[in-house]
Swiss-Prot record:
Family stated for the protein in its record: Belongs to the venom metalloproteinase (M12B) family. P-III subfamily. P-IIId sub-subfamily.
Binding site for Zn(2+): H333, H337, H343
Glycosylation sites: N216, N257, N351, N371
Residues annotated as binding Ca(2+) 1: V403, N406, I408, E410, E413, D416
Ranges for domain Disintegrin: 401-487
Predominant location: secreted
Subunit and partners: Heterotrimer; disulfide-linked. The heterotrimer consists of 1 heavy chain and 2 light chains (lectins): LC1 and LC2.
EC number: 3.4.24.58
Organism (species): Daboia siamensis
Post-translational modification: N-glycosylated; probably required for conformation. Removal of easily accessible sugars does not change its functional capacity, but removal of the core sugars with N-glycanase causes a virtually complete loss of enzyme activity, apparently as a result of major conformational changes in the molecule. Not O-glycosylated.
Protein name, entry field: Coagulation factor X-activating enzyme heavy chain
Cofactor: Zn(2+)
Record-level Gene Ontology MF annotations: metal ion binding; metalloendopeptidase activity; toxin activity
């Protein structure tokens, strides 16, 4: 078993508390000053690893309000993928992609000793920076910028002065699921990772021109890493793991039209991801960080339940200056919408004054999910079964040295079933993370009773007609990567064509937007898209609604019908001004026999739409 270095750091409290100070998070009106004093103590038998700058586990001892606290930290080993890349562009538009070393990084998660409900997200790159939750209260720690000093400030979130009184909103406007049964009380839905299947979101972040003007700034990278690390810590109770596989910087110009209209920008970003980014880098989800100030005080926006869909698996998040935790909460909020979670209503509760899915960002943002969010998430996984996030990264995709006992099967390990006390795998020796004598395997869909299954055995069944089954190779315990049916294959009794593993048809889009009673409106309703009016158009250019060509009317605005006896207008389906981003026909949707909608809102021949030499759709 690999030995790790245990570090103890004592934080001696300075003999005074400050009344007001300007820190990275803003003007803080009450804080404590502490001095981290690093004490290295190698456990018996441990070996120092000189090539590793940042230890895998660390422990900090300090005082908060005069009481001793022990903070245990463990490196976030799934923060980066092995093929993590960064992309910049030359002024002439040429792309340059590099793979910077990220294995020995300095981002940690943790807990407070003897506090079962505690948590922490810390950067140890230059001093200690981040936050921890102690006895239900959020504290922040960051280095004080004093010469020749190890001084740090510790303060509560409530002591950061508010920037303004204007409510900050999320741009997603849908409300609640049509519930089949009552939502459980919060006491019945205490969120722990053991309740949920582990999922991995392989994320690409795009930094737009407004935020990436200083493209060579190390501070921008640090900001992104801290935000993603904090968002991961928020998702831990739901067993959701966000792995950063790439960052792209739009240094000289934006590659889409980023405007003050959040919904227009979201549409443009989704189209760009489907037609450009997906052809260059395999990933599950893309997120745009921007400094653009959107209309209606919108902080973020996404497509509800869009995860794993080419056009809809995207979010936009407005960065909040140096308040990285606030940005992380917004990021987690929008990703949660993409995972099927709605805004909290008046009956939604968590053990905090507000919850992650509140439609308005609180002065003191919460890290807790409500009973409603847990219900929404469980229901989403059951109904939608998003394929891409159930593919864990391959062992070689997890960076940093392996740690035996963390239940992550990493490069160099034959198995990892957790600690000896908790291991329930009969094939694995928990103390060494090696297979027991006679065992051929200990993990994987192609492993049964410690033996590798024979070649040709189905290890992952096709989920639907736009998926294909995977088979064991007979050489490995791992099931091959999930493959999808060829784009353009007819599906759902010829009502649609497969597109990146989905069968997008208008009926399902109407149901997703308006509930199970909704249906597609009559063909005559789509003639409204010829007008270029408020409710009928094909696309927008510089804020102007462009009418559809006659052959493209079914690729513009989506018209749905509510099959209710009280509904007298067959073309009447209300979209508010904030709903426009979700009222368009999805790319890949069948518009005529043998034709589908492309990203330009054109109804084109299905064979032309899916011609590709790279294996990616050119729709």
């Amino acid at each position: 078993m690999m030995q790790v270095l245990l570090v103890t750091i004592s934080l001696a409290v300075f003999p005074y508390q400050g009344s007001s100070i300007i820190l990275e998070s803003g003007n803080v009106n009450d804080y404590e000053v502490v001095y981290p004093q690093k004490v290295t103590a190698l456990p018996k038998g441990a070996v120092q690893q000189p090539e590793q700058k940042y230890e895998d586990t660390m422990q900090y001892e300090f005082e908060v309000n005069g009481e001793p606290v022990v903070l245990h930290l463990e490196k976030n080993k799934i923060l980066f993928s092995e093929d993590y890349s960064e992309t910049h562009y030359y002024p002439d538009g040429r792309e340059i992609t590099t793979n910077p070393p990220v294995e020995d990084h300095c981002y940690y998660h943790g807990r407070i000793q003897n506090d079962a409900h505690s948590s922490a997200s810390i950067s140890a790159c230059n001093g200690l920076k981040g936050h921890f939750k102690l006895r239900g209260e959020m504290y922040f720690i960051e280095p004080l910028k004093l010469s020749n000093s190890e001084a740090h400030a510790v303060y509560k979130y409530e002591n950061i002065e508010k920037e303004d009184e204007i409510p900050k909103m999320c741009g997603v406007t849908q409300t609640n699921w049509e519930s089949d049964k009552p939502i459980k009380k919060a006491s019945q839905l205490v969120s722990t990772s053991a309740q949920f299947n582990k999922i991995f979101i392989e994320l690409v972040i795009i930094v737009d021109h407004s935020m990436a003007k200083k493209c060579n700034s190390t501070a921008t990278n640090t900001k992104i890493y801290e935000i993603v690390n904090s968002a991961n810590e928020i998702f831990n109770p739901l067993n959701i793991h966000v792995t950063l596989i790439g960052v792209e910087f739009w240094c000289d110009r934006d590659l889409i039209n980023v405007t003050s209209s959040a919904d227009e920008t979201l549409n443009s970003f989704g189209e760009w991801r489907a037609s450009d980014l997906m052809t260059r880098k395999s990933h599950d989800n893309a997120l745009l960080f921007t400094d653009m100030r959107f209309d209606l005080n919108t902080l973020g926006i996404t497509f509800l339940a869009g995860m794993c869909q080419a056009y809809r698996s995207v979010e936009i998040v407005q960065e909040q200056g140096n308040r990285n935790f606030k940005t992380a909460v917004i990021m987690a909020h929008e990703l949660s919408h993409n995972l099927g979670m709605y805004h909290d209503g008046k009956n939604c509760i968590c053990n905090d004054s507000s919850c992650v899915m509140s439609p308005v960002l609180s002065d003191q943002p919460s890290k807790l999910f409500s009973n409603c969010s847990i219900h929404d998430y469980q229901r989403y996984l059951t109904r939608y079964k998003p394929k891409c996030i159930f593919n864990p990264p391959l062992r070689k995709d997890i960076v940093s040295p392996p740690v035996c006992g963390n239940e992550i099967w990493e490069e160099g390990e034959e198995c990892d079933c957790g600690s000896p006390a908790n291991c329930q795998n009969p094939c694995c020796d928990a103390a060494t993370c090696k297979l027991k004598p006679g065992a051929e395997c200990g993990n994987g869909l192609c492993c049964y009773q410690c033996k590798i299954k024979t070649a040709g055995t189905v290890c992952r069944r096709a989920r639907d007609e736009c998926d294909v089954p995977e088979h064991c190779t007979g050489q490995s315990a791992e099931c091959p990567r999930d493959q999808l049916q060829q784009n353009g294959k007819p599906c759902q009794n010829n009502r649609g064509y497969c597109y990146n593993g989905d069968c997008p048809i208008m009926r399902n889009q109407c149901i997703s937007l308006f509930g199970s009673r909704a249906n597609v409106a009559k063909d005559s309703c789509f003639q409204e898209n010829l007008k270029g009016s408020y409710y009928g158009y094909c696309r927008k250019e510089n804020g102007r609604k462009i009418p559809c060509a006659p052959q493209d009317v079914k690729c513009g605005r989506l018209f749905c019908l509510n099959n209710s006896p009280r509904n007298k207008n067959p073309c009447n389906m209300h979209y508010s001004c904030m709903d426009q981003h979700k009222g368009m026909v999805d790319p890949g949707t069948k518009c005529e026999d043998g034709k589908v909608c492309n990203n330009k809102r054109q109804c084109v021949d299905v064979n032309t739409a899916y011609q590709s030499t790279t294996g990616f759709s050119q729709i």
